[in-house]
Amino acid sequence: MAEAAPDDVFSDNITFPAADGYTLSATLFLPRGRRRHHAVLISSATAVPRKIYRRFASYLAARGCAVLTYDYRGIGDSRQRAVTGYNQPKSLVGFKATMADWAALDVSAAVAWMRSRYKNLPLNYVGHSFGGQALGLLANNNDVKRALFVAAVAGYWKLMKSPERYRVFVLLNFVGLPLTRLLGYMPGWAGIGEDLPKGVFEQWTRWVMSERYLLDDPDLKAITNFVKYKGELRSLCFSDDLWTLPAIELLCSAFKSATPEVITITPQDAGAKAIGHFGFFRPEHRDTLWRGAAEWLEAEG
């Protein structure tokens, strides 16, 4: 069944293959009765299912964009189902995945799928948190013409505001790692959102504890792909986000062939009490933050 959407938007739940053939679940949002002028791919934050982005995706589609949201492997509807017949998610114990896999296998396939389906439209990209990081790791990232990052950081723990940095340090090292090694996966109930595959959580923890985050990972060969991106790049920083401006600037600094534009937004700018790391996607921002984002994504040149 398609997800609920406004009357001027059609949405359809679909699947497409990752680069290694793994089946990924997605939702395609299309405008009804008007010409499509852009294709937009929305890539999620860590442990966040695609349904969180459906209202923003519908908003873009209503303006004439073909929009795809999707779940990374092991997350949301891209988590395999148990064989019980009750449509319950299968245990993540033994499930093999890392954040590098999400980028190389899942995000790259989503870019390729949209590029193939909408050959005649400019392909733009919205990356929330990890979704922004992932763009730099893609071998095919230069297929993207414009990228809008939303709270996308190189999340070294010491760049976070206090006391958030200490909460994250304890959560990852003294709660998350022991739980992950005991259970075989990181349970969402521990305070991270959705359950995470063991390999994803362990790699994320290593990055968070490294001064330049993923840029310090000697085994991450895909770092060399950052320089391939030559499109427009705008990165949104929210003043009340506990993951801070220096972390955003650190990530942007890796895009050597682009000229990143970092914009800091206060809640007052949006007429809101708070925005933080996740608030951009709340529908209360449709006439403020969303409109500005859409106009930038739809711009030419």
Kindly label every feature range from the protein language model.
Residues 229, 235-237:
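Short beta-strand/loop motif that positions the catalytic acidic residue
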Residues 93-117:
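Alpha/beta-hydrolase active-site loop
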Residues 265-301:
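Catalytic active-site module of serine/aspartate enzymes centered on a nucleophile-bearing elbow/loop
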